[in-house]
Amino acid sequence: MQTQLVNPDALLKGLQALLAEHQINAIVEVHNPATILENAYDASSPPQFANLIIRRSHLNTPNRYSLLDVGFKRNQLGTFELIADDWDLRQNAIGQAIGNSTEFLRAVQVQYNIAIVQQTMSPHLWNHSQIQILDDGTKRLVLTQRPIEVITLQEIHHANPTANRHRLSP
């Protein structure tokens, strides 16, 4: 399933799940309106803004400090787009765990899709906690419909025998 990133709550949950899955201890900031991304690489470049931000200070590795924040900005069409420098991303904790910006965006998309399904498919009717990882690394979210429980009046009476007894006053 390929979708556009339009739901900020699902994007936030997807990013948080992806970071946790790869043991990247980073906070995802949410800003509305968009706020400026930090850039320690080129102070002369025009500032970039994003609505969801992973600060560079959370993306350092033992061998290198990250130079740029990673963000997602809502564009004029209402979808979120990745704002990241591919070179810096490949060097930081995200790149070390996931890969380049294309691979990162693909992984975000998978977690976003899972978050959308979990938001829209009622957990009272559907069990969606099982995620299968296939041989090729693809993730599959398995949805199974929960059985609908039917409780008869007889079962209610046996559970609480006095619940259905009414006394009539003379």
Feature annotation, model-predicted:
Residues M1-P170:
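Interaction-mediating elements
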